[in-house]
């Protein structure tokens, strides 16, 4: 059974010992959510808190990374549970919104955000191409 929980510094170190390249994503005043199967971390979400300037003048959580490591566990609700956990944390911390950036071609990620009632705003480049979408959830 998969357990979703607030991650600890120990959990973060367990992740980094197995996936050292993830260290570049763990920055800022962050929150870690992990998905565990027994003692095995099978997924995680990292979001950092940052200020939003005028006209909002509030704080948001920006999701830097969300991943379910094992392909056979993807599309089984683990990502949704981690997103719901970060929404719960953000509400408790009284932030204004949660946002993330998604590559346009990542269709399964777009489905995850829509399922969790995030708005999707494609970012059109000067050449007319849409390279990324920003997703947002106002609390």
Predicted features, each with a name:
Residues 24-25, 35-36, 80, 86, ...:
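Preference for well-ordered, secondary-structure-rich cores of eukaryotic proteins
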Residues 104-122:
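Conserved active-site alpha-helix within GNAT-family acetyltransferase domains
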Residues 33, 122-139:
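C-terminal "cap" of GNAT-fold acetyltransferases
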